[in-house]
Amino acid sequence: MFQKFYPDVYMDSTYEIDFEQLYQDGYRGIIFDIDNTLVTHGAPADTRAIALFAELKRIGFQCCLLSNNKEPRVKMFNDSVHVNYIYDAHKPSVQNYKKAMELMGTDKNSTVFIGDQIFTD
């Protein structure tokens, strides 16, 4: 019953993920948490995050930030990476995961979620 709460893969850092392989495997959308997933809590997008999103766009991914934070925090990060975003997402409720996939034009079979928390992401 609780298996759906656990990730398929654990990584030490978002920046270790082989996104080219994910694309080759048929994934087309990536939903990201922000804090402690892409940057430290409350930090703006750094050069590493900006480069990552540029690379993801080059590969062909659609991306969406999904955060329980308020809009000013999410917008501050997104101003540097320019992707879809949803703030005040009420994770782990599935409603805004579905909305993110709608924004990206993907579905649950072609979308990956990347976050740092088991029960809130």
Positions of PLM-derived features:
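Amphipathic coiled-coil/heptad-repeat helices and related helical stalk/stem segments
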Residues: Y15, R48-A49, S93, I118
